[in-house]
Every structure is written in C-alpha cells, then in structure tokens.
Amino acid sequence: MSDTASSGPSRFGFFLAPYHPLTGNPTLQLQRDLELVELADRLGYAEAWVGEHHSAGLEIIAAPEVFLAAAAQRTSRIRLGTGVNSLPYHQPLMLADRLCLLDHLTMGRTMMGVGPGQLATDAAMLGIDPVRQRDMMHESMAVLVRLLRGETVTAETDWYRLGEARLQLLPYQPGGMEMAVASTISPSGAVLAGRHGAGLLSLAASDPSGYEALVPNWKVYEKTLLEHGHTVDRSRWRLVAPMHLAETREQAMRDAEWGVGHLVDYIEKLSGRTAPWGQSPRDAVRQWVGEGFPAFGRATIGTPDDAIATIEKLTEQSGGFGTFLLLGLNVADWEATQRSARLFAEHVIPHFTGANRNRIASLEWADANSERMIGGLQAGIQSAFDKHGKTLAAALGADEEGR
C-alpha cells in the first residue's frame, strides 16, 4: 500500500440500509448500527447515510431521521444523511419539517437523500402504483426545495395538497441543507438532481449495469445542471459499493461466509427464484466477488489493497467523484465488521487523501541530503571539541587530582 497522494475521492463514509439477519435480536442489531456510526466518527469517516424501508424483514429502519437523531447524540463530527427518504411515502411539508428539526439537533450535520422508494412491497402496502413512483418523487421534490428555502407554497397533485404551506423552522445550515438524489441505472435520478442543483448518489456503482451507467448518468446530470443554471461539481458525486476487508483475502472470505446466507435468502424471496450459487456460503461469496449478486452488485471482499484497486477502477470509469461510501451489509460478525472499518480507515483513506505525503517527502529529503547533513553534524561536534577542548581537559584533570 502506498501512502502517496492518489487521484480519487477525498471523502469516505458508510451507507447503511441496513441489512440484518432474521435471526438474532433486532434491538441489539439496531444498537450495533448506532455503534458502527459512532466508530466511524472516531475513525475519521466523513459521512454516514441510513435508509428507509418498511417491509421484507431485513431492512428494519423505518424512519432514518429518528435513527440519525440518536446517532447524533453519540457523535461529534460525522455528517448524517437520510439514505434515502422515499418521497412518494411522505407529505412534503411533514418531511421537510422533520429534516429541519434534525438539522438543528445535529447542529448542521444533516444531509437529505431522496429517492422514489426501492421495495415494491413498501409501495404495495401504501397503495402506490410503482409506475407513478418516479413522477411522485419529482412532484415532491419540486415543493421540498421551495419549502427548505423558506418560501410559502400552495400546490396540489393527485396525492398531496399544500395551502400556503411554510416551514416555521428553517435549516440550521446558513447555506441550506445539502441534498442528494439516488441514482441507479435509469437517468431519472440524474435529471432530478440536475434540475434542483442537488448532489448525485449512485447506489449501483458496483453492479455491472450500474457501472456502465455511471458515465451516461453523469452526462445527463451535467447537462441538466447547466440547463438550470447550476454549477457542475464532481465533488458532489457519491458512489456506493459493498466491501469487507481483512488482513488476507482468505480471512475476508471466511468472514463473509458467516452471514452471506441471509442476503442469498433475501434475494431469492424477493425475486421468487432459487439462486444456483446459493447452495453453500463459499459458493455465494465467490459469486458475489465474481459476477455479483442481483441488486447488490459485485463486492470487494479482500484486503485494503483490493479496496484501493476497486476505488481506483471506479475513479477511472466515472472520470472522478468526491465521496466513496461503503455499503454495510452485516455479512461478517460484529468483531470482523469493526476490524474491516478500522483497516479501511488505517490504509485506504490515507492512500486517497495523501495524508502521509509530506511525511514521506520529509524522509526522502532527509535521505537525499543525509551525507551533507551528517557531515555538517560531525563538523559541528568537532568544532565544539576544538572550542571547548581545553576547558574539558582542565575539568578532567581537576577531577583526577580530587581522587
């Protein structure tokens, strides 16, 4: 691993759906999610994003704002994002109100992530037509940004009505709350983000189709930003990919085998199909790092060097982005999950931030000038002896006489 400066993202964080096995204690699972955000804060990660889901059993955070309010009490620096609020599920004024409250409780550390909603089961329970979800997301965003700017809004659609609606509490952050729009393969998210000057949150960067869509979606985003008078800034682009690290690849594979079964079961039940590679944990992990899993893409399960290689590949493919987010999947046990977070912070983050570049340059300078420096040091010592030699000799002589 090199610690010299590298092109690539300069900020890192976690993206937590989160996914939890159906076995175990859900209360303790949520506590470990909070502990992971707390650990990320101590280790210097910049961001933590937390999702919103309402069905299928594994993704058990229904209100990311509530979870993040709890996380804010345990942390001091890390920024906290809703990853993401499913806009068709919420009356826009109520959602804006809750996020402004969270921004004040976190003293300006809140980020708002938005999307159409991922799980068909969530939409079905709410009586929402999946065909309408992206249109509903656009309709909600149109008034959300106005409310967050402090405007008074009167608007009506077939699913919400606002009459002279205004927020009584605006965001804590003077420049407004940072917003990001979820993007996978279709250009819908890129269009919405560009229209409103929000950041882009690419959730499927490690999926083969999502990987190929990175550049087309960026071009749509860039074009839409410019059409609406917004500044193009790659630092506001976030990419998400699953990773688990250990000291060796074999250890990382063994770690992932511990819990990969719950993801396989989840994929099979949501798709209604049996995965041929899901018969054993080892086969499942090999599939995941090879061709990848449906919806979850390809995982990097290996060493910090493997993580660096993956991020560099994403950088090359995308043309550059600002933040890399590790998708938290709870496939390893708690101790191994913490160790993975520490390895990433210790070795991967400094590689891209160049945290040690001046230390390395300082040692290289000392090496290149060592002969001159040592010569000068020796000359200085000799000069001191020449200058004070008589005094030293006299002191030694007096000491001998005293004996």
Name each region found by the language model.
Residues M1-L80, G175-M177, L363-W365, A393-R403:
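N-terminal beta1-alpha1-beta2 module of alpha/beta enzyme domains
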Residues S2-G8, V131-L167, G210-G322, I349-R403:
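An alpha-helical appendage that flanks or caps ligand/catalytic pockets
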Residues T4-S7, D41-R42, L68-R77, L99, ...:
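Acidic (Asp/Glu)-rich catalytic clusters
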Residues S7-L28, P88-W159, G199-S202, S206-V215:
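Flexible, glycine-rich active-site loops centered on histidine and acidic residues
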Residues F12-L16, A48-V50, L80-T82, T110-V114, ...:
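Hydrophobic faces of well-ordered beta-strands that scaffold small-molecule active sites
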Residues L16-Q31, N85-L93, Q173-I185, H244-A246, ...:
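Active-site mouth loops of central-metabolism enzymes
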Residues A40, G44, E52, A71, ...:
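Conserved, mostly hydrophobic/aromatic
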Residues E47-A71, S86, Q118, A205-G210, ...:
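Glycine-rich, proline-tolerant flexible connector loops at the mouths of alpha/beta enzymes
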